[in-house]
Regions:
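Short glycine-rich anion-binding loops that position phosphate/pyrophosphate groups of nucleotides
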Residues: 65
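Structural scaffold elements adjacent to functional motifs in cytosolic proteins
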Residues: 59-61
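Positively charged n-region of N-terminal signal peptides that target proteins for export
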Residues: 1-6
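Bacterial N-terminal signal peptides
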Residues: 7-16
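Rhodanese-like catalytic fold shared by cysteine-dependent sulfurtransferases
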Residues: 20-46, 51-54, 69-103, 112-171
Length: 171
């Protein structure tokens, strides 16, 4: 019985050591965002615009289908977060599994999800991976597109459909 108690207590203490090292998702993504800012991994709006027109760049969005349908950067690809590596294969590889687009800009609302996915994309072999906040795109009065349609979403939030700009951008 003493041995069982010693084992339980030691297991609890040993487990406590690991629990103290646990970092929350928010703290982890914040830490990665700070590192990305310091290392120059945060893309500028001009870099996103240039990437949309470049042959060797892909702008990929890791937000949910609903977020992407509500507002996305025209020309970006939604890869989601569940299996982004599979979705990327259709965008960045040719028929011989060679990179045709070896540079990525990863987009989400505030870059929290993008910075985490960027780590995986770097390990997959992408030469350059940058991160971008779609909120910045919108705040700087760039247009977004929506995948909602007035015909299908009559009870929606009265959002304008098609290309639209943030309200503060109206002249």
């Amino acid at each position: 019985m003493k041995l069982v108690k010693v084992f339980i207590v030691s297991s609890f203490l040993f487990g406590s050591l690991f629990a103290s090292d646990f970092i929350t998702y928010d703290k982890f993504s914040q830490k990665l965002k700070e590192e990305a800012k310091q290392s120059g991994m945060m893309a500028t709006t001009q870099e996103v615009k240039d990437a949309l027109n470049a042959k060797d760049w892909a702008v990929v969005d890791v937000r949910t289908m609903e977020e992407w349908a509500g507002a996305s950067i025209k020309g970006s690809f939604r890869v989601g977060r569940e299996t982004p590596e599979k979705a990327l294969e259709n965008i960045v590889l040719d028929d011989n599994d060679k990179f045709v687009k070896d540079k990525l800009i990863v987009v989400c609302n505030t870059a929290s999800r993008a910075v985490i996915e960027a780590q995986a994309f770097k390990q997959m072999g992408f030469k350059t991976v940058k991160i971008y906040e779609i909120n910045k795109w919108i705040d700087e009065c760039n247009p977004v597109v929506t995948k909602y349609s007035a015909g299908e979403h009559k009870d929606g939030t009265k959002t304008k459909f098609g290309n639209y700009y943030a309200e503060h951008c109206q002249k």
